Amino acid sequence: MSEDVSKNLSETLFVKHKQAKETSALTQYMPTSKKILDDREQQEDRAWYRHLRRLQWAWQGLSPIEMEGVLSRIASSTHSRTHDDWLDTVMGYHSGNWTFEWIKLGMEHQRRANDLKGEDAADELFTASLCFSIAGYPHLKNDNLALQAQVLANKAYSEGAEKTQYTIKQIEVPYQKRKIIANLHLPRTDKQLPVVMVSAGLDSLQTDMWRLFRNHFAPKDIAMLTVDMPSVGHSSHWPLTEDSSCLHQAVLNELYSIPYVDHHKVGLVGFRFGGNAMVRLSFLEQEKIKACVALGAPVHDLFTSPKKLQKMPKMYLDMLASRLGKSAVDINSMAGQMMAWSLKVQGFLSSRKTKVPILALSLEGDPVSPYSDNQLVALFSHYGQAKKISSKTITKGYEQSLDLAIKWLEDELLR
């Protein structure tokens, strides 16, 4: 994308949204729930509305120095905020606003791409796409700025796809009178390859996964297929229900018709809520899956502990409400509704084991995915394993554990 085209697209998309409602103010709560949130805000010492995913973003290819640069510009902004205590709630689309600053960084990477060729240019465009995606984080349904940022993320990704030496094809799978859009990444096209279906969480897009393919799967001649969770990104038409794996199951059942992949060698990787969907799919389609990795996946504990759900930061509650399509949120009622999402309550983690080996992994002290959840998954999987990443070596531990998990998956697939 030339600098002028990129600038024009950004200006066209955002010109109507100079005074767009700020993200943290979008979700409406019932009076009793609003009181719970207000009381909690006074007790807690949170400086940000959003959960800052520094480790994940760095692993996905963002420079920590650039990341801190953006965060410091947001933090030091003198513009008015929706919540004075939360640094990332600057109102209006201008300097200091979360979306504005991340879009600005994304456009900087697009500019760099113009001066480069081939793989170097592609890498800059994929990084730009990641910046645009973070600009829309946590991707609430009625967030106009986030929706515009998503348009830029998809455009930059498509342009990166044209420049890279690898082949990226958009696959369309018919489902409930619509089409599921997935991106198939191929290291080569002269033979059928093993394939890994990857799903991110409820607050990120499938276009965030480029580095996973480039650094891990491509060197081993493994294809990667990305699918958005229901209610997010390309899958935003479908509401999220306890049948969290419905879209991925539909895509899995179409793999035999894709000539580039070996549908007898299919692996799964799920991050956060995507892990819930992938574990579920490993029980439903045991004959079609060779191995599964779930990273930080909530499968039981969180859903059956209403008090834990009620104590979640506002961003997570806003995001869940958005995914469930709620316009006015009653926290207690929503916590009760989530009980049905437990894979144990659904009967998967309570009787028979799945043949699929599952590696369940999470950070030590993770409130969303406690070690007990991972142990439960490992217990009901043949050759399943549960692993905990020590928080003492969190930066190193995060990367090493992800590398270890992907290597384990490759070994299972290539047996």
UniProtKB/Swiss-Prot annotation:
**Record's InterPro entries?**
AB_hydrolase_fold, FrsA, FrsA-like, FrsA_esterase
> Does the keyword Hydrolase belong to this entry?
yes
E.C. number: 3.1.1.1
Keywords recorded for this protein, A-Z: Hydrolase, Serine esterase
Instruction: Name the Gene Ontology molecular function terms of this record.
Output: carboxylesterase activity
Keyword Heme among UniProt keywords: no
Catalysis: reaction(s): a carboxylic ester + H2O = an alcohol + a carboxylate + H(+)
**Pfam families this protein is in?**
FrsA-like
Annotated function: Catalyzes the hydrolysis of esters.
Which protein family is it in? Belongs to the FrsA family.
Spell out the PANTHER family in the cross-references: DIENELACTONE HYDROLASE DOMAIN-CONTAINING PROTEIN-RELATED, ESTERASE FRSA
Entry protein name: Esterase FrsA
Where does this protein come from, organism-wise?
A: Vibrio parahaemolyticus serotype O3:K6 (strain RIMD 2210633)
